[in-house]
Design a protein with these regions (language model features):
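Hydrophobic positions on the alpha1 helix immediately C-terminal to the Walker A/P-loop
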Residues: 42-43
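AAA+/P-loop NTPase substrate/partner-engagement loops
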Residues: 52-85
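Amphipathic alpha-helical interface elements
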Residues: 4-6, 10-11, 17-27, 34-37, ...
Length: 353
């Protein structure tokens, strides 16, 4: 699913392309990624491979944010001993490395992972000064990966900011779930419902979305227990535990919203179809009062409950099959109207029509 996300979801792929394009154009960047960014290692691997194709001269490297001051770390790790000996106190590391022609730093793309708030300021100041001192050579390109919200606003002149959460929205997560659902053993008419439900319940973590979609029917039967089981037994691609803080009650409310959005229009469609089929008989029974005491004068205003009432008083005669269907739709409508969720069997009966 990792390649599906980064290659086939439009905005996720554009996010990937923006990183590559920025690096190829020679600009360092401040890259804001949430802790739950999906398949980070795959993203880094894909960027490294793509940069190698775009600019074979430069090497791509990922490092964990070092404890040392940026310039000191780079001088120690990217300059030979004889070059390091040329460095003299009185000039900054950024000045020296920016002007230095004999360092492998000149042909590097360096991804610096998990940069803290304190270290971010150090690296931004270093890169800004480093860039000012680069003359007659290609500079090193730094990709500073930050995980704290709001830090992306700290970027300095000449350093581009690219933020995951500003590029990826809920629709992208739904699109991923829909694409993933097409590969499950779920019945085709259940797949859009599965995608909608997963994308709403697990919107904070695309990797958890992938796990839930893969469960298919098991997830649809009991979303809460399925997510609980995944959290207890599986981990994210980075080895970290899944984080999910919705309560069962909160999940029920979200499930109801999805069912209202998915099922209610089909109940309304069924009501209109019944009215069209028995319009003449219904018209002869009008005007009639509904359960709220309101007068109904037009067939189009007749609700499912009134249709059920007309059958009960034998004004409207339908087959046993039609009666069972009407009863199912009526019960489903009443449950949703009272903010109660439907069983999967009821959902199936309505969606497969």
């Amino acid at each position: 699913m990792d390649k599906v996300w980064w290659n086939h979801i439009t905005k996720a792929h554009k996010f990937f392309e923006d990183i590559v394009e920025t690096a190829v154009k020679g600009s360092s960047m401040l890259l804001s990624l949430p802790a739950s960014v999906p398949w980070k290692e795959t993203l880094i691997e894909m960027i490294g491979e793509r940069l190698q194709l775009e600019n074979p001269k430069n090497a791509f490297q990922e490092i964990s944010c070092p404890k040392e001051e940026p310039g000191e770390y780079l001088l120690t790790n990217y300059c030979k001993k004889e070059i390091r000996l040329k460095y003299r106190y009185g000039m900054s590391y950024a000045q020296f490395l920016g002007a230095c022609q004999e360092t492998v730093l000149n042909d590097r793309y360096i991804w610096i992972s998990d940069v803290s708030k304190e270290k971010c300021e150090e690296w931004l100041e270093f890169i800004e000064e480093y860039n000012k001192n680069v003359v007659n050579k290609t500079p090193a390109i730094f990709i500073l990966e930050i995980n704290e919200e709001g830090m992306e606003r700290k970027a300095k002149k000449g350093i581009k900011t690219i933020a995951f959460n500003q590029n990826i929205g809920n629709y992208d997560k739904y699109a991923f779930c829909a694409l993933a659902a097409s590969e499950t053993n779920c019945k085709e008419y259940l797949r859009p419902y599965l995608a909608e439900l997963v994308s709403i319940l697990c919107s904070e973590d695309v990797e958890l979305c992938a796990e839930c979609v893969e469960k298919g029917i098991e997830f649809l039967k009991n979303p809460y227990q399925t997510i609980k089981s995944i959290i207890e037994t599986d981990v994210r691609s980075n080895g970290e535990e899944y984080q999910f803080d919705k309560t069962e009650k909160e999940m029920e409310s979200l499930i109801w919203e999805v069912q209202l959005k998915t099922v209610f229009p089909l109940i309304e469609k069924y009501r209109k179809r019944m009215i069209l089929s028995y319009r003449g008989i219904i018209t002869r029974e009008l005007p009639i009062r509904n359960g709220y005491g309101q007068s109904i004068n037009e067939p189009e205003e007749v609700e499912i409950g009134v249709l059920y009432y007309l059958i009960g008083k034998s004004s409207l005669k339908i087959s046993e099959k039609e009666y069972t269907e009407l009863e199912n739709y009526r019960n489903a409508r009443n449950r949703l109207a009272h903010m109660k969720i439907l069983e999967l069997s009821t959902i199936e009966q309505i969606l497969k029509k």
